[in-house]
Amino acid sequence: MLRRGDRGEAVRVLQRCLRSAGYDLTIDGVFGRITLECVKSFQATHDLDRDGIVGPLTWGKLEEVCREVMPG
C-alpha cells in the first residue's frame, strides 16, 4: 500500500504509471499533495473508493491502464 508521505521507488512506479495515463505530475518518488490529487482523480474515474490510498484494487486498475498505454 502507498499513501501520502511515502517515498521511494514504488512511488516512482506509481507516478510513472499515472503520468502515462495522462496525469500531470513530477516523477520524484515523493507521495505528496499532487500525487494524492492524481490518485484520487484516478480512483474517481475508475469507480474506486476515492481515499487516496493505493491498495490492491487501485494498483490492479493502475496496472491494467499502464499495460494498455505502454504495452509490452
For the regions a language model picked out, list residue spans one by one.
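Acidic, Ser/Thr/Pro/Gly-enriched interdomain connector segments
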Residues: 1-30, 34, 68-72
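Extracellular LysM carbohydrate-binding repeats and other cell-envelope/extracellular binding modules
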Residues: 35-37, 41-72
